[in-house]
């Protein structure tokens, strides 16, 4: 698989779980002989929600909530067949969304 690049995008709400999963992917790729570029931290997406506290009248009383989505980018350059097999068998945390492009 010379000249190919595998691009992996990871998303999670908790940055600690995201960093642990990223480190696990990097260690697996390096152990099988592939070159890794990254992890590159991408901008966080912050969604803010404003809701009324009470069900009836008091419009001035509100709560604000936010969800932060943390993202990382990895490039695996010139992956070997062993690298692809190891990445397919890798078991990552449940809270991490993974997108892979070859």
Curated annotation (Swiss-Prot):
<dbReference type="GO" id="GO:0003735">
    <property type="term" value="F:structural constituent of ribosome"/>
</dbReference>
<dbReference type="Pfam" id="PF00338">
    <property type="entry name" value="Ribosomal_S10"/>
</dbReference>
<protein>
    <recommendedName>
        <fullName>Small ribosomal subunit protein uS10</fullName>
    </recommendedName>
</protein>
<dbReference type="InterPro" id="IPR027486">
    <property type="entry name" value="Ribosomal_uS10_dom"/>
</dbReference>
<dbReference type="GO" id="GO:0000049">
    <property type="term" value="F:tRNA binding"/>
</dbReference>
<dbReference type="InterPro" id="IPR036838">
    <property type="entry name" value="Ribosomal_uS10_dom_sf"/>
</dbReference>
<comment type="similarity">
    <text>Belongs to the universal ribosomal protein uS10 family.</text>
</comment>
<dbReference type="InterPro" id="IPR001848">
    <property type="entry name" value="Ribosomal_uS10"/>
</dbReference>
<dbReference type="GO" id="GO:0006412">
    <property type="term" value="P:translation"/>
</dbReference>
<keyword id="KW-0687">Ribonucleoprotein</keyword>
<dbReference type="GO" id="GO:1990904">
    <property type="term" value="C:ribonucleoprotein complex"/>
</dbReference>
<comment type="function">
    <text>Involved in the binding of tRNA to the ribosomes.</text>
</comment>
<dbReference type="GO" id="GO:0005840">
    <property type="term" value="C:ribosome"/>
</dbReference>
<comment type="subunit">
    <text>Part of the 30S ribosomal subunit.</text>
</comment>
<keyword id="KW-0689">Ribosomal protein</keyword>
């Amino acid at each position: 698989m010379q000249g190919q690049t595998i691009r992996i995008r990871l998303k999670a709400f908790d940055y600690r779980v995201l960093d642990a999963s990223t480190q696990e992917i990097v260690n697996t790729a390096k152990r099988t002989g592939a070159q890794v570029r990254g992890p590159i931290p991408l901008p966080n997406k912050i969604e803010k929600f404003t809701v009324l506290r009470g069900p009836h009248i008091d419009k001035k009383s509100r709560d604000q909530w936010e969800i932060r989505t943390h993202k990382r980018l990895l490039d695996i350059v010139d992956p070997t067949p062993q690298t692809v097999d190891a990445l397919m068998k890798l078991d990552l945390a449940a809270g991490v969304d993974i997108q892979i492009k070859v």
